Amino acid sequence: MVSSKQTQLKKGKQPSWIEMYLPKEVRPYAHLARLDKPIGSWLLAWPAFWSVALAADLESLPKMLAIFGWWAVWIRGAGCTINDYFDRNFDKKVERTKSRPLASGAVSPAQGLWWLAFQLFIGLGVLYQFNVLTLALAIVHVPFVFAYPLMKRITYWPQAFLGVMISWGALLGSSALKGSVVPSIAYPLYISSFFWTLVYDTIYAHQDKVDDAKAGIKSTALRFGDATKMWISWFGVGCIAALVIGGLILNIGLPYYVFVAIATGQLVWQIFTVDLLSPLDCGKKFVSNQWFGAIIFTGILLGRLFP
């Protein structure tokens, strides 16, 4: 039998750290949680990190970032697992996804559900140290995580639902530190993250648009078609406008706006240079969004340090 490492080498791919360092029995579960592809965890974590950076004092900041980073890794893994569970029959028809553990049979549906329960337990467990509101918000978030994969079957706007779900950390960060969802902190960040998600996940959806159309999977990529760049340009405007308005409300220092300007340039670069006919380029532009999140986070910190 050819090992997964040998198969990857034959396809011209370098084996990930999962193949190199994890026991064979564990590898399918690590792949199911996309532990070798951290971009999804970053995208879930950044709204929480932004909110924490605005709400926390410098002494508590490292601990809070570690807690929400842990939460993001495991909840994102749970989201990938439930997505693959619901989509396992569709994934078999899509070139990019047919080798996923549930689609390929490396993990059975029952095993996938047990793995899902474990990830939710670990991800939510770390939040038990916070107030009741924060824990309640985290629990309310879970049905949105479960529902997202189903949206691709009923609407051409699943990316909007993803924006609602993946921006949740903006609410949790202020709640955990302030005891309530502080509107001046949480709402501008949530709105900005929502529009940002519409930009990057529409680009992401263009990778699979041909296979998705054949399989009956809906997306904004298929909805917008040749008008995609116009649509995501307006979403980008909404994202940046919310960040600027939030900064003005909180009276954040000048460095924040400098970094928002840099992030704007990064977003403009994505939108105007992405080749929507190239799955490879769409994937690269999607992954580059980890840097957009980092730029905004840096701007928030410096804006608070140098008001």
Swiss-Prot record:
GO terms for cellular component: endoplasmic reticulum membrane; mitochondrial inner membrane. InterPro entries: HB_polyprenyltransferase-like, Prenyltransferase, UbiA_prenyltransferase, UbiA_prenylTrfase_CS, UbiA_sf. The keyword Transferase applies. Changing residue 153 to A: Reduces activity 18%. Its cofactor is Mg(2+). Changing residue 84 to A: Reduces activity 98%. Changing residue 152 to A: Reduces activity 99%. It catalyses: 4-hydroxybenzoate + (2E)-geranyl diphosphate = 3-geranyl-4-hydroxybenzoate + diphosphate. Changing residue 212 to E: Reduces activity 97%. Pfam families: UbiA (PF01040). The keyword Cell division does not apply. Prenyltransferase involved in the biosynthesis of shikonin, a naphthoquinone secondary metabolite. Could accept only geranyl diphosphate and not dimethylallyl diphosphate, farnesyl diphosphate, or geranylgeranyl diphosphate as substrate. This is 4-hydroxybenzoate geranyltransferase 1. It comes from Lithospermum erythrorhizon.
